[in-house]
């Protein structure tokens, strides 16, 4: 699985103009917030590796929320995250590990925890204007449509000014699989993602 667990030395990291002194605030899990997320679960979606039906999680939200809140908080504070990993064949030689992708099967409660962490991280990044306005992926209020609107605007502007316009469309092979985790974690540290949350993300990526 070398294509997935790419290693890269942080010694050769390019200089970055972003090195926040401000650290992301500690995430405090609230029972009410967990209960709300449980109530919003789609009961018709498949359950996770724990085989707990979504309908049970949704209908028992009030009873489950206090315990899950404690587990979520403990996971963040200790950096411990249980995993169940399965290899999924994509294409090519079935006898070569290169053509299999390891998938971490996540339980529904764990997905809720991931959502909470992601929301806190995005709030931190948005607050400090770390994300460029040109990044339209995986952001609230941004989408393929907003990216297309910007592209069309730039095209029409170039046409009006009678300037040359070149468009390069790139598709990186296994882009997500080959991100060096050491470099990613180093970058997150520069962005103020430190302490227990950084340790949790390290476990998540391992």
Question: Where are each of the predicted segments found?
Answer:
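Residues that mediate protein self-association or partner binding, especially
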Residues: 5, 38, 89, 109, ...
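Conserved short loop/turn motifs at secondary-structure junctions
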Residues: 52-60, 135-140, 169-175
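Conserved polymerase palm-domain catalytic core
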Residues: 172-206
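Conserved catalytic palm subdomain of right-hand nucleotidyl-transferase polymerases, strongest
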Residues: 44-52, 95-105, 146-186
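Conserved pre-motif C helix in the palm subdomain of viral-like polymerases
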Residues: 1-5, 98-127, 147-150, 173
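Amphipathic alpha-helical interaction/coupling elements
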Residues: 55, 67, 116, 150, ...
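A short alpha-helix capping/helix-loop junction motif
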Residues: 127-134
């Amino acid at each position: 699985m070398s294509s997935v667990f790419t290693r890269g030395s942080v010694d050769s990291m390019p200089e970055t103009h972003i090195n926040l002194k401000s650290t992301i605030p500690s995430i405090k899990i609230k029972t009410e917030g967990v209960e709300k997320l449980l109530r919003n679960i789609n009961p018709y979606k498949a359950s996770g590796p724990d085989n707990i039906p979504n309908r049970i999680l949704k209908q028992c939200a009030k009873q489950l929320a206090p315990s899950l809140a404690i587990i979520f908080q403990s996971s963040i504070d200790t950096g411990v995250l249980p995993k169940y990993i399965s290899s999924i064949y994509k294409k090519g030689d079935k006898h070569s590990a290169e053509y299999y992708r390891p998938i971490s099967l996540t339980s529904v409660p764990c997905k809720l925890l991931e959502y909470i962490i992601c929301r806190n991280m995005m709030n931190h990044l948005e607050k400090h204007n770390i994300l460029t306005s040109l990044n339209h992926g995986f952001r609230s209020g941004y989408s393929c449509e907003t990216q297309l609107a910007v592209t069309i605007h730039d095209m029409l502007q170039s046409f009006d000014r009678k300037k040359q316009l070149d468009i390069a469309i790139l598709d990186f092979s296994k882009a997500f699989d080959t991100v060096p985790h050491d470099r990613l974690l180093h970058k997150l540290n520069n962005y103020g993602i430190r302490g227990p949350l950084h340790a949790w993300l390290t476990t998540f990526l391992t």
